[in-house]
């Protein structure tokens, strides 16, 4: 048995060194053409090493540190913070999934949060403006709303900027608050990927098998059923209605931002982006994205503000998107610039300016 496990581990290391989709994608897209391949491999290795706990909902384990990612003691990506907030601090949380977390960011400083913090630091104000990255990979609207209600409100936020809407192609899942007895053991097993490639290679092998059985565009759970999106959008809208009402009750503002998606704006795609638009068309929300954007009019009645970001890359000629929804540092900076403009009125109002 030990020989089999050792063989699987060695094989996994050899295969993933050449076939890791994160590394090959970053390399082929030339989205980081000024970075060495060793830097890109490190970025992907650090991403794969992040440890998550699954109950009561998926969240980052605290106190994780690599060359490109830091998870603080509160489970947020970025520098350390205190839960209590001084009177002269204006606290902003960025909420969302992998795009907000910064899945392909080269550092904590090149995420939405990192760029937004840098811009806000240039303001001449007596307040300390604190931007916290509450993004978590694979979060949908239910996950984010649960995170807000059970965790973020305990940090006394002044402003929540929620990047959401592109995941309505799949039904939102309810959060299971019942913690299984094996949970502590599973948390310990999750740490194995810090030392071994076998868990990652197992997932890689499983995906290869599924693609061989069902084809590139037939893997179960990936295809968006557009006839179901309208119902999903209604649930999505009601979720953020509830959070915006909570903001009124607890004295924090909520901005809902619909993120850019490849093909949803008027950006002329590069060859890499065009390739993905064709290859990943079965996973694209674009044919139904208008339903999400139209819903912003309703959310405006409850939330502090809403914004449609789908056109912010229209004037960009280079590659922005790595796939259909994820982009690298250059895209993060453009999104942060828009979020900066949106946040200013709410900050100045609370600061008395």
Regions found by a protein language model. Give the residues of each.
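Membrane-interface motif at the C-terminal end of an N-terminal transmembrane signal
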Residues: 4-21
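Loop/turn elements at helix/coil->beta-strand transitions in domains of secreted/extracellular proteins
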Residues: 89-90, 127-129, 155-160, 248-255, ...
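Serine-dependent acyl-ester chemistry module
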Residues: 165-297, 314-318
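Second-shell loop/turn segments in exported
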Residues: 99-107, 133-134, 229-233, 282, ...
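Histidine-centered active-site loop/cap adjacent to the catalytic His
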Residues: 7, 12, 236, 296, ...
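Internal alpha/beta domain cores that form substrate/cofactor-binding pockets in large enzymes
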Residues: 91-94, 119, 127-155, 160-207
């Amino acid at each position: 048995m030990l020989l089999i496990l050792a063989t699987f581990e060695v094989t996994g290391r050899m295969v993933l060194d050449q076939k890791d989709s994160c590394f090959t994608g970053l390399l082929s897209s030339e989205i980081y053409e000024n970075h060495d391949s060793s830097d890109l491999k490190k970025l992907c290795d650090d991403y794969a090493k992040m440890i998550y706990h699954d109950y009561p909902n998926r969240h980052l384990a605290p106190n994780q540190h690599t060359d490109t990612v830091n998870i603080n003691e509160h489970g947020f990506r970025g520098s350390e913070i205190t839960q209590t907030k001084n009177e002269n601090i204006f606290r902003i949380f960025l909420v969302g999934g992998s795009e907000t977390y910064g899945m392909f960011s080269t550092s904590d400083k090149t995420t939405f949060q990192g760029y937004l913090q840098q811009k806000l630091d240039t303001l001449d104000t007596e307040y300390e403006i604190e931007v916290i990255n509450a993004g978590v990979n694979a979060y949908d609207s239910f996950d984010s709303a649960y995170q807000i209600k059970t965790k973020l409100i305990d940090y006394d936020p002044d402003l929540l900027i929620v990047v959401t809407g592109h995941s309505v192609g799949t039904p939102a899942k309810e959060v299971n608050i019942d913690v299984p007895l094996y949970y502590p053991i599973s948390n310990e097993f999750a740490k194995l990927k810090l030392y071994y490639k076998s868990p990652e290679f197992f997932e890689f092998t499983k995906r290869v098998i599924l693609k061989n059985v069902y084809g590139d565009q037939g893997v179960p759970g990936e295809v968006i059923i557009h006839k179901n999106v309208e119902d999903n959008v209604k649930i999505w809208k009601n979720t953020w209605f509830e959070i915006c009402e909570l903001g009124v009750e607890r004295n924090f503002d909520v901005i809902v931002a619909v993120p850019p998606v490849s093909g949803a704006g008027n950006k002329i795609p590069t060859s890499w982006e065009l390739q993905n638009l064709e290859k990943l068309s079965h996973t694209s929300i674009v044919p139904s994205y208008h339903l999400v954007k139209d819903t912003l009019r309703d959310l405006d009645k409850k939330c502090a503000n809403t914004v449609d970001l789908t056109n912010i890359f229209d004037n960009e000629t280079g590659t922005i998107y790595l796939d259909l929804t994820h982009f690298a540092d250059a895209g993060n900076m453009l999104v942060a610039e828009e979020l900066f403009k949106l946040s200013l009125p709410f900050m100045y109002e609370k600061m008395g300016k």
